[in-house]
């Protein structure tokens, strides 16, 4: 089944697309995950900790293109993380790659279709709070969607979720506290703040950084917000963690680069991996 990744995918089209995706995955694995984990730029090493895993390249799944962003391997994996069945995305799809919002969120919706009820989203982000230097880990307490897009535009799929989705607690308070508890147990410093999602792929100007900070943002990136909207629409609980890879434009006086993002991910990735592994191990069974 071939799809153009630029073709709009309204919510009403998602059930049929998810049927095809689920069938393709089930042809390779019958594992029913409890948790879904999305690994952002430079954070893919957690996938190395999976056991009994099955790896499926994005391009092998119907309608999904290969991931093109550096630091995103572009694989869906099913396996055991410290004895807990999980589904993991080693990389993600972005709108700046030319993908429709409905396609960008399909991986998270597929995680729910496969059985995961808890979704952990990670990303690399720029720091808006001057106190959040490179290497800071931040639990996402709330977000501001400045992409100008939503995955819920168009006829609804009532079988998945409501027409009008409440986002009061988009990031589940109980899961946020569990992340903080896991970080304390691992002696990892973990902050909390507001994530602002932009379209990308350009980094922000210094003037935009000042504006976003004035709006209450603590970190800024090019992902996550649409995935959270779709996950909450599908009745999934969401936790999010940003790795601040660089100060916002204008703070340091240095130009920004994706190489800097990947290097920070390599340095801080092991700390984040320890927190997520403990979080997953200690998550109560449904």
Which residues fall in each region the model found?
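Generic non-transmembrane alpha-helical segments
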Residues: 24, 28, 174, 178-188, ...
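Glycine-rich tight-turn/loop motif centered on a GG-T
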Residues: 157-168, 214-217, 252-265
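Polyanion-binding loop/helix "lid" in catalytic or ligand-binding cores
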Residues: 160-171, 183, 197, 209, ...
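His/Asp/Glu-rich mid-to-C-terminal helical/loop segments that flank catalytic regions of hydrolases
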Residues: 249-286
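Metabolite-binding pocket within alpha/beta catalytic cores that recognizes anionic/polar moieties
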Residues: 2-167
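Zn-dependent metallopeptidase/amidohydrolase metal-coordination segment
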Residues: 222-260
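Active-site-adjacent substrate-binding region
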Residues: 172-234, 238
């Amino acid at each position: 089944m071939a799809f153009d990744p630029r073709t709009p995918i309204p919510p009403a089209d998602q059930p049929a697309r998810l049927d095809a995706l689920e069938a393709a995955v089930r042809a390779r694995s019958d594992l029913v995950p409890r948790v879904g984990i999305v690994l952002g730029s430079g954070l893919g090493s957690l996938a190395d900790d999976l056991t009994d895993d099955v790896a499926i390249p994005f391009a092998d799944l119907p309608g999904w293109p290969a991931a093109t962003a550096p630091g995103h391997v572009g694989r869906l994996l099913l396996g055991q993380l410290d004895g807990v069945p999980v589904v993991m995305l080693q990389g993600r799809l972005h709108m700046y790659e030319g993908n429709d919002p409905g396609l960008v969120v399909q991986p998270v919706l597929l995680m729910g279709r496969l059985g995961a009820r808890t979704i952990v989203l990670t990303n690399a982000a720029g720091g808006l709070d001057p106190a959040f230097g490179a290497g800071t880990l931040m639990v996402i307490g709330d977000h501001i969607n400045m992409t100008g897009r939503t995955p819920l535009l168009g006829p609804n799929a009532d079988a998945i979720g409501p027409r009008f989705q409440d986002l009061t607690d988009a990031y589940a308070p109980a899961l946020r506290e569990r992340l903080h508890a896991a970080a304390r147990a691992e002696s990892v410093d973990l902050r909390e703040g507001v994530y602002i999602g932009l379209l990308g792929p350009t980094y922000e100007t210094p003037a935009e950084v000042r504006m976003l900070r004035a709006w209450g943002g603590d970190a800024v990136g090019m992902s996550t917000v649409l995935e959270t909207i779709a996950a909450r629409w599908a009745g999934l609980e969401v936790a999010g963690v940003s790795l601040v890879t660089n100060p916002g434009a204008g703070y340091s006086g240095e130009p920004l680069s994706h190489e800097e993002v990947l290097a920070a991910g390599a340095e801080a990735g092991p700390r984040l991996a320890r927190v997520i592994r403990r979080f997953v191990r200690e998550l109560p069974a449904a």
